[in-house]
Amino acid sequence: MSYIYNLLKQFLAFLLNTTDKYVGNFGISIIIVTILIKIILLPLTLKQDKSMKEMKKLQPELEKIKQKYANDKQMLNIKTMELYREHKVNPLGGCLPILVQLPILFALFGVLRSGIIPADSSFLWMRLADPDPFYVLPVLNGAVSFLQQKLMGTSDNAQMKNMMYVFPIMMIVISYRMPSGLQLYWLTSSLIAVIQQYFIMKKGA
């Protein structure tokens, strides 16, 4: 697994450096490569969303089965699998796309943390190898994180509602000392995720 991860890192490092040679700015290279990766992974994102929607539709029937066979675990499992087969739903369908995406996104994150960003490279007001001096990127990352959770919908659970406000603050605290290049990747990736989520929800409406 580590061998595949290292290969991914080498490929992504090559992609970043090659893009930088053509565009002449490492910040723009980070944005372009992040967008490219997100586009490549879009079919998996759509597949994951479709699988999650199918599972959501089955929830009322799954609850009935759970109540009916609450004291018979074996029959509960049999009836649950029968329901999945009947509706041609794979319960792991929502997990598999994530398992494919995560190594790629972590590899890109790892490449940017490894010192690949040239020490003298800059983008807008910031030096990419240093933290954002005005803390604009950490605040934007927190705001986009909040927007992302709002798009996904609020839960009736009080703890989950609190997390919707706590998590963006945690994002700001975690990221404010990170190199600006890493924060730029994080922001670009999150913004694309928000745009994707918006259009997926609009399509399903």
Curated annotation (Swiss-Prot):
GO-annotated biological processes: protein insertion into membrane; protein transport
Predominant localisation class: membrane
Record flagged with keyword NAD: no
CDD domains: 5TM_YidC_Alb3 (cd20070)
GO CC field: plasma membrane
Compartment(s) of residence: Cell inner membrane
Listed Pfam families: 60KD_IMP
A GO term, aspect molecular function: membrane insertase activity
Topology of this chain in the membrane: Multi-pass membrane protein
Stretches that traverse the bilayer: 26-46, 92-112, 181-201
NCBIfam families linked to this entry: yidC_oxa1_cterm (TIGR03592)
Assembly mode: Interacts with the Sec translocase complex via SecD. Specifically interacts with transmembrane segments of nascent integral membrane proteins during membrane integration.
Family indicated by similarity: Belongs to the OXA1/ALB3/YidC family. Type 1 subfamily.
Name listed for the protein in its UniProt record: Membrane protein insertase YidC
Source species taxonomy: Bacteria, Fusobacteriati, Fusobacteriota, Fusobacteriia, Fusobacteriales
Gene transcribed to yield this protein: yidC
